[in-house]
Amino acid sequence: VKSLVGRVRAGLRELFALPEGYEVLLGNGGTTAFWDAATAGIVRERGLHLSYGEFSSKFASATKKAPFLADPIVVEAPAGDAPDPLTSGQTGADVITWAHNETSTGVMVPVARPAGLDDGTLVLIDATSGAGGLPVQIADADVYYFAPQKGFASDGGLWLALASPAALERIAQVDADRPTVGATRWIPEFLSLTTALDNSTKDQTYNTPAVATLFMLADQIEWMLANGGLDGMVARTTASSSHLYGWAQAGAVTTPYVSDPAKRSLVVGTIDFDDSVDAGAIAATLRANGIVDTEPYRKLGRNQLRVAMFPATDPSDVQALTACIDYILEQNA
């Protein structure tokens, strides 16, 4: 296990060209566990959260429920859009958070450190479905966290975080001081980022992880490095997404759901269909023929398909998918 964790940490350090002083942390539980860990161990008093979909709203929900934190500041945008983090640097928060890619809607938001942040405000980026397939300069984030089951073609149940020196200092301070604006702050050992850091630097985890998950993750990272690194992966997702959105714009009954081209994700594409076409029936036909998981996010409730375009997906597969959809449309015309 230590050898596998070491391969993962070394590979991520190279893939993301980590600046001096950054550390790779990991632990069990996936991104959901990390939201709770960050709530308990990084946010001192109040968080500022950009909320624009099912998953970007969950961190805000976690900090709102914490009895030892002040209510978060939440900047919202409707589904299919996103707030601009560069203009959202309100005062009064010691962390600002947003999702690099909102998985439910296919909206991506670049990682850039907002100007005018209060001194000591940390930038936390949820890259659960964006890491490995979207461009990023890690120095623009204090914590860039994700899980293996999207861009890294592994299984879930594990979280990984690339943490800056400022974030590491905050973790130590919160653990030592236990700041509170209400009830006493309790940090369960399972959610302790101090414990996660201590174990990660020894190439291990606090709880034994699934070895298969680590093996697939390490192997995928090394494949990424052998095929052009992060730039090579972004080239693949760009090719896939350019084809998908170009196809949708050219179609008579299809439209990219995200109206702003700059916010259309390179890794999760959402395509709306005209009311004359039942997108659910198309997804069912695809599934019956072995092409699975093109259904939209269930809570969005739109007549659309959602297409994964992570680095492991060959761009030619996206081209084949749109050809299959065209065939279904022709047969039902």
Language-model regions: role of each:
Residues V1-A37, S61-A62:
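Conserved N-terminal alpha-helix of the aminotransferase class I/II PLP-enzyme fold
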Residues F152-T238, S242-Y245:
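Active-site C-terminal subdomain of aminotransferase-like
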